[in-house]
Curated annotation (Swiss-Prot):
Keyword entries, A-Z: Antibiotic, Antimicrobial, Bacteriocin
Descriptive protein name: Bacteriocin fulvocin-C
Primary role: Bacteriocin.
Domain of life: Bacteria
Biological processes, Gene Ontology terms: defense response to bacterium; killing of cells of another organism
Gene source species: Myxococcus fulvus
């Protein structure tokens, strides 16, 4: 699945790929949930 990004800094939820970046590997956000995100510019957070 792909996420829709309006800007390069928008985030994609787990198990999606960034439409303006490359296929993402995922890392925990550290926000106290099981969700992980990658940024559409290809940077990981």
């Amino acid at each position: 699945a792909n996420c829709s990004c309006s800007t390069a800094s928008d985030y994609c939820p787990i198990l999606t790929f960034c439409t303006t970046g490359t296929a993402c590997s995922y890392t925990p956000t550290g926000c106290g949930t099981g969700w992980v995100y990658c940024a559409c510019n290809g940077n990981f957070y």
